[in-house]
Amino acid sequence: MGPGRAAEVIREGLYRGADNGYLLTDRAFAGADTLATSYALATAIRKIGDYDIIIGGRQAIDGDTAQVGPQIAEKLHLPQVSYVAEIAVENKAVTVKRLLEDGYMTIKVQTPCLLTCVKELNDARYMSVGGIMECYNKPLEIYNYETLKDDPPHRRGYHRPERLSHECVQVLLSPGEGRRYDDGGRRQGDRRE
């Protein structure tokens, strides 16, 4: 998820052996907090479907919160392990080595699952010229707000809460919904004897 220029980063993943690449880009996603980001990504993952393991980074460089991966797992009802430094896949199970402050923890989890990984996980593959040329035939799908939207009420999931404050005030003060009070704290029209 990012601006159009993020396609180059996804292409690099294709150069290094990924089968498909997906980019979520739209001005509607700009400035999204972790909840909005995880909602958009989970919606895209549901739309793409057919996955065993969703692998993400430990944290974003802009927010540095490490919340998006676990929030996606929650929205997709998947088991998740964070700070993964090693992965071994066997049938429908994944054994991971999770980085801790004072060592490692080995965890076995069933697929489908979501893993957020530390940079020590592996060394990037060498990109051959042939591989770079071949990747241009691999699909890079672009998703935007229109291709991802599922229900109009969920539109709010893509925006920061503070952007919705004006909309909330309008709903609260809409005709028939608002109440007026006098200086004594009594609702106008009420009679107190």
Segments predicted by a language model, with ranges:
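N-terminal glycine-rich FAD/FM-binding segment characteristic of electron-transfer flavoproteins
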Residues: M1-E193
